[in-house]
A protein has these predicted regions:
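Polar low-complexity intrinsically disordered regions
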Residues: 1-4, 72-73
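Glycine-rich phosphate- or other oxyanion-binding loops that anchor nucleotides, phosphorylated ligands
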Residues: 31-271
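N-terminal beta1-alpha1 ligand-phosphate binding loop
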Residues: 3-28
C-alpha cells in the first residue's frame, strides 16, 4: 500500500464501512460528534454519512471545509456503497461514468483516468427503487456526493463505486444486511487499485499546483490585499509553469517594499 493516500472515502452505512476499515487498517477518528469517522497514518479518511442526498452532502461539506488548504492542495473523493439493478448479478460492481439525479434529471460524467475498473451508469433516487426501469445502478447518494465533492476537488478525482445488492429476482426488501460487508470485501482488489490510482493522480495535481516558497515569503513580509495575494498567486503559478521558479528570487520586494511595484516587476519579467 502507498505511504501517502490523500483520499476521502464516504459511505452511507456502517456495514459498508466494515470491510474498508479492515482492508485499509483504519482506526476510529475522534472528530465530529455528528459523523462516524476513521483514518490512518497514510492520510486516508473514511466517514459514515448516513443515508440520502442531504446526509452525504453534509458529510462531504464537513470534511471539505475541515481539510481546506491555504496552499490550494486538494484530496481525492470516493463514494462506496451498495445499489440495486434490474438484472445485474448480485455482487457485480462498477465505477459510475454517468451519474443521474432522478428528481432533477441532470447528469454528471466523472472522467475515468484509472484503468482496470469496470464502469457503468448510476441513478440516484430519493426513495428505494424496486422496479429499476433503466439499466443502471440505483442508489440514494451519488449525485449529491459528486456535486458537493467537486467543490473541493477536480472532476476526475471524484468517483463513485457501486456494488449490486438487489435486483428484480432478489428484491431490496429481502436484502440480508449481514452480507453487505462481504459484498464490499469481494471487491477489495479493485478498490485498492482505484484508491492507489486516485492517490497518484491527486499527488501529481498537488505537485503541479503547489505554490513556490517565494509566494509564502512575500505574504509573510509584505502587507498585501486579498486581490494582491490572488495576483501574486497567479504570477507565481505562471513562473512555475514556465520553468522559471528560480527567477522569482531575483525579483526585489521581500523587505517591505511597494506591493504594486513588485507585481509590475514580476509581470514584466514574463510578458
Amino acid at each position: 500500500m502507498k505511504s501517502s493516500m490523500p483520499v476521502n472515502i464516504v459511505v452511507a452505512h456502517g456495514l459498508e464501512a466494515k470491510a474498508l476499515v479492515k482492508m485499509l487498517k483504519l482506526e476510529r477518528h475522534q472528530g465530529s460528534s455528528e459523523f462516524l469517522e476513521y483514518s490512518n497514518s497514510n492520510k486516508l479518511r473514511l466517514v459514515v454519512s448516513g443515508i440520502g442526498k442531504e446526509a452525504v452532502a453534509a458529510a462531504v461539506a464537513y470534511l471539505g471545509e475541515q481539510q481546506a488548504s491555504a496552499d490550494g492542495e486538494i484530496r481525492a473523493w470516493l463514494n462506496v456503497g451498495i445499489a440495486g439493478h434490474r438484472d445485474a448479478p448480485l455482487g457485480s460492481a462498477w465505477l459510475g461514468n454517468k451519474i443521474t439525479d432522478h428528481s432533477s434529471g441532470s447528469s454528471a460524467y466523472p472522467p475515468q483516468l484509472i484503468e482496470g475498473v469496470r464502469v457503468g451508469s448510476v441513478v440516484t433516487v430519493d426513495e428505494p427503487e424496486t422496479s429499476y426501469p433503466l439499466a443502471a445502478a440505483y442508489e440514494m447518494e451519488a449525485s449529491a456526493f459528486y456535486a458537493e465533492a467537486t467543490k473541493y476537488s477536480t472532476a476526475e478525482l471524484v468517483q463513485v463505486f457501486k456494488v449490486i445488492s438487489d435486483n428484480l429476482e432478489n428484491p431490496i426488501s429481502e436484502i440480508d444486511l449481514k452480507l453487505v460487508p462481504d459484498l464490499i470485501a469481494a471487491h477489495i482488489p479493485q478498490l485498492l487499485t482505484l484508491i492507489e490510482g486516485m492517490s497518484e493522480l491527486v499527488e501529481q495535481h498537488n505537485c503541479s499546483q503547489r505554490l513556490p516558497s517565494y509566494y509564502h515569503e512575500v505574504c509573510s513580509k509584505m502587507r498585501l490585499t486579498v486581490n494582491q495575494r490572488l495576483q501574486l498567486k497567479r504570477l507565481c503559478q505562471r513562473y512555475k509553469a514556465l520553468g522559471l521558479e528560480a527567477e522569482l528570487a531575483k525579483v526585489a520586494g521581500l523587505k517591505g517594499g511597494d506591493a504594486k511595484q513588485l507585481m509590475r516587476q514580476l509581470a514584466e519579467r514574463i510578458d
